[in-house]
Amino acid sequence: MTESFTRRERLRLRRDFLLIFKEGKSLQNEYFVVLFRKNGLDYSRLGIVVKRKFGKATRRNKLKRWVREIFRRNKGVIPKGFDIVVIPRKKLSEEFERVDFWTVREKLLNLLKRIEG
């Protein structure tokens, strides 16, 4: 299994995001909301939505890099065949300067592992 984050594994189209928001199931913890929906493919695709309220662009981009890296390095434990949208919650925004990558990784992976059809 390759550890790259290829173009086909990204959610890019507005209609894909809207479909997940409309028909997807959700899981959440104190840091993230994860929406997911079966995609009929043999791989999962990831989309990330970070609101401007989260902070300036550098903070938003840093979080998106972290989420992509977590997805990329842990494809083996994330169920295949789903479109996944990750949305950070207010608590993560408030604590972002104090939490490290490993804490964010643990919280996100706990949710991603729970995805099921």
From Swiss-Prot:
GO terms for cellular component: ribonuclease P complex. SUPFAM superfamilies: Ribosomal protein S5 domain 2-like (SSF54211). It catalyses: Endonucleolytic cleavage of RNA, removing 5'-extranucleotides from tRNA precursor. InterPro entries: Ribosomal_Su5_D2-typ_SF, Ribsml_uS5_D2-typ_fold_subgr, RNase_P, RNase_P_CS. Pfam families: Ribonuclease_P. Its EC number is 3.1.26.5. Gene3D superfamilies: 3.30.230.10. It is an enzyme of class 3 (hydrolase). GO terms for molecular function: 3'-tRNA processing endoribonuclease activity; ribonuclease P activity; tRNA binding. GO terms for biological process: tRNA 3'-end processing; tRNA 5'-leader removal. Keywords: Endonuclease, Hydrolase, Nuclease, RNA-binding, tRNA processing. The keyword Ribosomal protein does not apply. Belongs to the RnpA family. RNaseP catalyzes the removal of the 5'-leader sequence from pre-tRNA to produce the mature 5'-terminus. It can also cleave other RNA substrates such as 4.5S RNA. The protein component plays an auxiliary but essential role in vivo by binding to the 5'-leader sequence and broadening the substrate specificity of the ribozyme. HAMAP family: RNase_P (MF_00227). Consists of a catalytic RNA component (M1 or rnpB) and a protein subunit. This is Ribonuclease P protein component. The gene is rnpA.
